[in-house]
Amino acid sequence: MRTLWIVAVWLMGVEGNLYQFGKMIKNKTGKPAMFSYSAYGCYCGWGGQGKPQDPSDRCCFMHDCCYTRVNNCSPKMTLYSYRFENGDIICGDNDPCRKAVCECDREAAICLGENVNTYDEKYRFYSSSYCTEEESEKC
């Protein structure tokens, strides 16, 4: 179900943070975010519960945790300014909410890039039925 929702969002052309985050992921991993990470493991994609399946999935878990610490805005839809410079992602917004969301996305994209060698096709389009709430970790 979450896979269908993610695909629907991308097909509708929703602008905002999801698009920007996808560009960061592509920059750091070389992989298209929508097809590689939109439903990867238990945490990459919309929602998340259970135990992270590998280091790449743990990056998404940490990203979800980061979003829970962002107050007074909608992280998944907040637009922010950033740029790529000499291989780095630079968040350039002075608004505290936008800056925090950008930093969450930046850290996750870097983490995914650092763990791209752990990416395992068996976790792509992973069934959420394997991700049980009883095994969920706390942020």
UniProtKB/Swiss-Prot annotation:
InterPro entries: PLipase_A2, PLipase_A2_Asp_AS, PLipase_A2_dom, PLipase_A2_dom_sf, PLipase_A2_His_AS
EC class: hydrolase
Disulphide bridges: C42-C131, C44-C60, C59-C111, C65-C139, C66-C104, C73-C97, C91-C102
GO term, biological process aspect, one: arachidonate secretion
Family annotation (Pfam families): Phospholip_A2_1
Subcellular location: Secreted
Enzyme Commission no: 3.1.1.4
Domain of life: Eukaryota
Functional summary from the UniProt entry: PLA2 catalyzes the calcium-dependent hydrolysis of the 2-acyl groups in 3-sn-phosphoglycerides.
The protein's name in its UniProt record: Acidic phospholipase A2 5
Organism: Echis pyramidum leakeyi
